[in-house]
Amino acid sequence: MFSKKPHGDVKKSTQKVLDTKKDALTRLKHLRIVIENAESIDLKQFFDQHFSHIYYVFFENFVTIEASLKQKGHKSQREELDAILFIFEKILQLLPERIHQRWQFHSIGLILKKLLHTGNSLKIRREGVRLFLLWLQALQNNCSREQLWMFSCLIPGFSAPQSEYGPRTLDNLINPPLNLQETQVTIEEITPLVPPQSGDKGQEDLTSYFLEALLKYIVIQVKSLEWKNKENQERGFSFLFSHFKKYYLPYIFPNICKENSLYHPVLDIPQMRPKPHYVMIKKDAETNEAIYCTKEPFIKARVIVIRWLVSFWLEPKPHTGPHIPGMEGEVLPKNIQ
C-alpha cells in the first residue's frame, strides 16, 4: 500500500493522520501528503477504512478556517479555504457509497449551503455548485426534496419552484424563515464565507454564467466519483440530467415538441414561427454600435444548451477521420466519420 513515495515516508504520514493525540492541523497536513502521494486504488481503500478519522480532520479544520475568514478575511485565509475544499472534494469523490447512504448528510449539506450562499463571491458560489453536483451525483434517489429544490435554484433567473411552503429560493432554502410560534429554538443564520472583494470581476449575465457551469460539471465530473460499481457513474449523470430537463428545459425551450423523437421523428412541415421582435438594449462603449436583444426570455440560455449538445455531436478527430474533398479543416459529425 502507498507505493509512491516522492514526499518522505507516506506510511508515517498515514499513522499521523490516525493519531488522535495530534492536533487537527497537523493531521490535515499529513492527510494532504497521503492524498498527493498515494496510488488511486490505495487511496480509495484508505478512505474506506478510515472515513471517520478523515471527516473529523476535515471538519475541525473547516470550522477553524471559517472562523478565521470571518475575523480577518485576508488572501491567506482564502487560500486556506481552497486547500480545505480540496480535502472536501476528495471525500465526496472517494466515499460515494457511504454518501449514497446519507453518511454525514446534514453536515455536508450545511457546508454546501455556506458555499452556495448568494452573498459569497462568484468564484465561491461556482465552486459550491460544482461540489453540490458531486454530492447530488452520489446521493441520487436518496436525496431529500430540499436538495432537489436547491438544484432547481442553482441557476439564477428561473422561476422559483413551488411547494406547500410557498416559492422556494436559494436564499430561503439556505436560511429558512423563522416561525417562532412553532418553537423558540432557532438555528444559527448561515452567512457568506467569502463576500465579493473590490477587485473581483463581476458577471453581467448570471443566468448564462451558472448555466454554463452546471452543464459543464454534470459531464466532466461523472467519472471522478470512485464507485466500486462503475455503473453508478452513468446512473449519477442520468439522475442529474433528468432533473435538469425537469426544472430548467421547460423554461429554456417552452415550445419544444414532446412528441418528437430521434427514433420516431415527426416529418410534417411545421408552422411558421413569428418573427422575433428586437429592441436596442445599449451601445458598445468602444465602437458605439447598437446592441440588440430579443424580448423572448432565456434566448441566451437556449443558445448555451444547443452549443453544449452540439459539442458532443461535433467532435474533432484530426487524424482518424476519412478525407472528404472540399471539407478540409471542417469538423465532421460522428455519423459521417
Curated annotation (Swiss-Prot):
Location(s) in or outside the cell: Cytoplasm; Nucleus
Source organism, top-level taxon: Eukaryota
Complexes and interactors: Component of the heterodimeric RalGAP1 complex with RALGAPB. Heterodimerization is required for activity. Interacts with the HLH region of TCF3/isoform E12.
MF terms (GO), sorted A to Z: GTPase activator activity
Gene Ontology biological process terms in this record: activation of GTPase activity
Keyword Protein transport: no
UniProtKB keywords: Cytoplasm, GTPase activation, Nucleus
UniProt function note: Catalytic subunit of the heterodimeric RalGAP1 complex which acts as a GTPase activator for the Ras-like small GTPases RALA and RALB.
Cell membrane listed as a keyword: no
Organism: Sus scrofa
A GO cellular component annotation in the UniProt record: nucleus
Name of the protein described by the UniProt record: Ral GTPase-activating protein subunit alpha-1
PANTHER family according to UniProt: RAL GTPASE-ACTIVATING PROTEIN SUBUNIT ALPHA-1 (PTHR10063:SF3), TUBERIN (PTHR10063)
Coiled-coil stretches noted in the UniProt entry, renumbered to this chain: none
